[in-house]
Regions:
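Small-residue-rich transmembrane alpha-helical segments that form helix-helix packing/gating elements
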Residues: 1-32, 37-174
Length: 174
């Protein structure tokens, strides 16, 4: 029974991570009406940038600071890509939009290969979330438990942003 519970919790953690990625993709599609194939590549770029920043910034502040700074850096890159690549194809047929975003994937992947190389990079776990919690004798990573707890708050915050704020009204009107 303990293994079953551990598997359920692992599934919930994976679902939480996928929810976060999918909600970003859904928001971007809702605003731009472009299926952005490069969405995952921006997550990859954020992971690499975060990894590099963690090598420079020390300790716990370095980890969380690197995560926030990587998000800002990739966000700025995303804005540049939107202005330079996506805006010119908004009125084009969907096939051109897909080809444009696929081209962005290729560029980001090649840049990542040039900068970080083909070797897998393993970054540190989040400070305070490195251990496991035993549930009915089965180990469940603390990171998974944190993800399960955080996901409903993110879902609520997104719901509130979209339905109760001026920004949300503008996003829904787009």
């Amino acid at each position: 029974m303990g293994l079953f519970i551990a598997q359920i919790l692992t599934g919930l953690a994976n679902a939480g991570a996928l929810f976060m990625v999918a909600s970003g993709l859904s928001l971007i599609f809702g605003v731009t009406r472009v299926v952005n194939f490069a969405h995952g590549s921006f997550y990859m770029l954020g992971a690499y940038v975060g990894y590099s920043l963690m090598q420079v910034l020390p300790g716990m502040v370095g980890f969380w600071g690197a995560i926030l700074l990587a998000g800002l850096i990739v966000g700025v890159i995303g804005v540049i890509v939107e202005i330079c690549v996506l805006r010119p194809v908004y009125s084009a047929p969907e096939l051109f939009q897909l080809v444009a975003t696929f081209g962005v994937i290729l560029v980001i992947q090649d840049l990542a290969l040039m900068i970080w190389g083909p070797t897998d990079l393993l970054g540190p776990r989040a400070p305070g979330l490195k251990g496991v919690i035993r549930i009915m004798g089965e180990p469940v990573p603390q990171y998974d438990i944190a993800l399960i707890i955080i996901t409903p708050f993110v879902a609520f915050a997104l719901w509130y942003l979209i339905t109760k704020t001026r920004v949300g009204t503008l996003v829904r009107a787009a």
